[in-house]
Swiss-Prot record:
Renumbered residue ranges of the record's region Disordered: 222-249, 327-351, 536-560
Catalytic reactions on record: Endohydrolysis of (1->4)-beta-D-xylosidic linkages in xylans
Pathway noted in the entry: Glycan degradation; xylan degradation
Its job: Endo-acting xylanase which displays no detectable activity against polysaccharides other than xylan. Hydrolyzes glucosidic bonds with retention of anomeric configuration.
Domain CBM2: residue ranges: 242-333, 553-644
Active-site residues (renumbered): 126 (nucleophile), 216 (proton donor)
Stretch list, region Linker ('hinge') (Pro-Thr box): 337-350
Residue ranges, compositional bias (Gly residues): 231-247, 547-558
Name of this protein: Bifunctional xylanase/deacetylase
PROSITE patterns from the UniProt entry: CBM2, GH11_1, GH11_2, GH11_3, NODB, TAT
Signal sequence, renumbered to the chain: 1-43
Family membership noted in the UniProt record: Belongs to the glycosyl hydrolase 11 (cellulase G) family.
GO molecular function, one term: polysaccharide binding
Length: 644
């Protein structure tokens, strides 16, 4: 392992916990050539791999002296304090379809994972099966769910380009993720179930390299003590659960609260409003309760049809020896007692806003599994919200970004891939925010004016970057703790503390948040509080503007509206394309920032060059472009439209 290779690894990381070390990977690659050794149960503090007590182990850190691992029988005790990045664990030099059992303690502060982790080659893939985490739950492009070992995992895929891997220090490869919806520390991971679920979504593995039950941390502190062993099974068939479809509709399952004897599941149907869903219970499972649908049948099969409450329903399943989520299939013909015609969405009743407005915020979207459910609930209740997507998720889910815009929610910026920005250089901060601005402009056609720093961490340098992009920093007054495994009732209780102008932190991905949202909106209505948007001037929740939709990319008066999409950018200038809708006879007023000036324009007649600029049609249609000189400000000029 050369010094140059280690130096490359030390500086390469941009997203916390996104990809493991080239140094660790290189060590694992040659693990088969290592002589079997049995180190004493002493603290390991330097980068190494080997065998101990019959298990392969790996230890890597870029902050020597701040992390140690004691090699104990069957597992290791790891301690870390204010470390940069590390990963440590025990497992097998050659992975595969193993049933892995583990137990112990995992006590992170801030950013860490407890994960079954490994690599394959041909194709080169880095994979994670995450059972618990600290302050950040990993996300990516949402691919579906898999139910295994008593829990439901969200499946994500991400890609790394020119990054260290087990094959060298400049590889391009996919990462596959299964992230448990409810945290746990201890149990069984049937890896074959995850491998099969990934394969069903085109996420194929190759020849297995190493596999370890790992603790990984980044810029955090904590401790873990994990004992690992291999079970008797080989992984079995894929227990993908979660949904299926036929003849025009599909159904997805979201696991919710769980107790020792029972658990809740929410099923959501798409593609038809006249549907029949068949649930296949496992073993001796029974249905204790249901809501928002008619449920009939006995034995191992239940038939579910609409009852006028929409296309989402829930059941409480008594385990009776099985914790597996009942599989669901959908038929769009309705059949039997299904509602013969689509059930209309209820028109929201007028609401008093005499107590003021509050800001519901959802971070880390959009996600295929939950975003549409959140938007559907908001629409049903005549409510709105502010969303803070990451640039990575925005780029990977353009249709959901359009869904955000069409639903009229306010769209802010949440960085490209959720790093600890305060530990980055100013240029890296600038890149994180600028790339996200561009991704949102390209996918939703709006320009954010709000920014929420990941983890709520900020400093003077970051605020300077925000200001240069015309962004207002938004934190929160109430933390729902949904990121920390809070239940739906706990999230709802947190929202009950909101008062006029205040903002609550929630996230796009937790199933419990989706389940809590209807109750939150009902509670606000009963208190004469309305949902609003966040003012970029004051940072407080206010009545939503009539323009709706985005985060400050445009506005309208009369019968036209205008949106802005940021284009090319250079050191001294940038391009913006403005698109007008609603009228062919329009006047757009542009508000330039600071010392900005107009260098050139196309497809419209412009009057003025600094301060306030007016644009009118010149016969070239309803889209026009402008090149602005920055002169100290990179913020996109705001635009309003009036018919003329």
């Amino acid at each position: 392992m050369s010094d140059s290779f280690e130096a490359t690894r030390t500086t390469r990381r941009r997203r916390p916990l996104q990809a493991l070390t080239g140094l660790l990977a290189a060590g694992a690659l040659v693990a088969g050539a290592l002589a079997a050794a049995s180190p004493a149960a002493a603290a390991v503090t330097s980068n190494t791999t080997g065998t101990h007590d019959g298990y392969f182990y790996s230890f890597w850190t870029d902050s020597p002296g701040s992390v140690s691992m004691d090699l104990n029988s069957g597992g290791g005790y790891t301690r870390w304090s204010n470390t940069g990045n590390f990963v440590a664990g025990k497992g097998w030099s050659t992975g595969g379809r193993k049933t892995v059992s583990y137990s112990g303690q995992f006590n992170p502060s801030r950013n860490a994972y407890l994960t079954l982790y490994g690599w394959t080659q041909s194709p080169l893939v880095e994979y994670y099966i995450v059972d618990s985490w600290g302050t950040y739950r990993p996300t990516g492009t949402f691919m579906g769910t898999v139910t295994s070992d008593g829990g439901t995992y969200d499946i994500y895929r991400t890609q790394r380009v020119n990054k260290p891997s087990i094959e060298g220090d400049s590889s391009t490869f996919y990462q596959y993720w299964s992230v448990r919806q409810q945290k746990r520390t201890g149990g069984t991971i049937t890896s074959g179930n995850h491998f099969d679920a990934w394969a069903s979504k085109g996420m194929n593995l190759g020849r297995h390299n190493y596999m370890i039950m790992a603790t990984e941390g980044y810029q955090s502190s904590g401790s873990s003590s994990i004992t690992v062993s291999e079970g008797s099974g080989g992984g079995g068939g894929g227990d993908t659960g979660g949904g299926g479809g036929s003849t025009g509709c599909s159904v997805t399952a979201t696991r919710a609260e769980e107790w020792s004897d029972r658990f809740n599941v929410t099923y959501s149907v798409s593609g038809s409003s006249a549907w029949t869903v068949n649930l296949a219970l496992n073993g001796s499972q029974t249905i204790q309760a249901s809501w928002n649908a008619n449920v009939t049948g006995s034995g191992s099969t239940r038939t579910v049809t609409p009852n006028g409450s929409g296309n989402t329903f829930g059941v409480t399943v008594m385990k009776n020896g099985s914790s597996t989520t009942p599989a669901a299939t959908c038929a769009g013909s309705g059949g039997g007692t299904a509602t013969p015609t689509p059930t209309p969405t209820p028109t929201p009743t007028p609401q008093s806003c005499s107590a003021g407005y509050v800001g519901l915020t959802f971070d880390d979207g959009p996600n295929t599994g939950t975003t549409n459910q959140i938007l559907s609930t908001l629409t049903q209740y005549g409510a709105t919200a502010t969303v803070f997507p990451t640039g990575q998720n925005a780029q990977g889910n353009p249709s959901l970004m359009q869904a955000y815009k069409n639903a009229g929610v306010q769209i802010g910026n949440h960085s490209w891939d959720h790093p600890h920005l305060v530990n980055m250089s100013q240029s890296d901060m600038q890149s994180q925010l600028t790339r996200t601005q561009q991704a949102i402009q390209q996918t939703a056609g709006v320009t954010p004016t709000l920014f929420r720093p990941p983890y709520g961490e900020s400093n003077a340098t970051l605020r300077q970057v925000e200001s240069s992009l015309g962004l207002r920093e938004i934190i929160w007054d109430v933390d729902s703790q949904d990121w920390n495994n809070a239940s739906a009732s706990q999230i709802r209780q947190a929202a009950s503390r909101l008062t006029n102008g205040q903002i609550i932190l929630m996230h796009d991905w937790p199933a419990a948040t989706v389940q809590a949202l209807p109750g939150i909106l009902q509670d606000l209505r009963s208190r004469n509080l309305c949902t609003g948007h966040i003012s970029s001037s004051t940072g407080r929740a206010v009545a939503p503007s009539s323009a709706g939709g985005g985060g400050g990319g445009g506005g309208g008066t009369g019968s036209c509206s205008v949106s802005a999409v940021r284009g090319e950018e250079w050191a001294d200038r940038f391009n913006v394309t403005y698109s007008v809708s609603g009228s062919s006879s329009w006047v757009v007023t542009l508000g330039l920032n600071g010392g900005q000036s107009v260098q050139s324009s196309w497809n419209a007649a412009l009057t003025g060059s600094s301060g306030t600029v007016t644009a009118r049609p010149n016969g070239s249609g309803n889209s026009f472009g402008v090149t602005f000189y920055k002169n100290g400000s990179s913020a996109t000029p705001g635009a309003t439209c009036a018919t003329g």
